[in-house]
Amino acid sequence: LVTGRPDYIPLGSTANKQGRVAGENAAGGQAMFGGVVGSMVVRCFGLVVATTGLTAAQARALDYDVQETTIQAQDIAHYFPGAADIHVKLIADGKTNRLLGGQIVGQRGVAKRVDVLATALHNRLTIADLQGLDLTYAPPVAPVWDPILIAANVAAR
């Protein structure tokens, strides 16, 4: 979905979506597979690592004008007990400011946030669009400035 080009992304989630399309069509339907953005998440040694869309290296190889932004923030309100670091990297096209991909590393809230980026990729959002997202706020679970919003604000500078 990001590049419009075919890609090999061997994930169970992709296989399930394609299976659903195949099953519906086998029963006489007209379903189409819309594509994927390649969202992946793993937990390793207490950290959650997630990616979606293109990496900076992939974007460069496809001749995008790559704009990389990396920030460190807190996964919940910084003054709330248990707040931990979370790192967000956004990859955007410098010519159009369209989001091309992102990676997130932290202890919690990573999968939810990479899903926000995947939704942004699916809808071809720009960095400015990300800045305008209305994300949740509650000190024990979500800071007033979500790390995605912080990264988008830094990327817009």
What are these regions (language model features)?
Residues 1-57, 140-157:
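A conserved FAD-binding loop/helix module that cradles the flavin
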Residues 45-52, 60-157:
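Flexible, glycine-rich terminal cap/loop adjacent to redox cofactors
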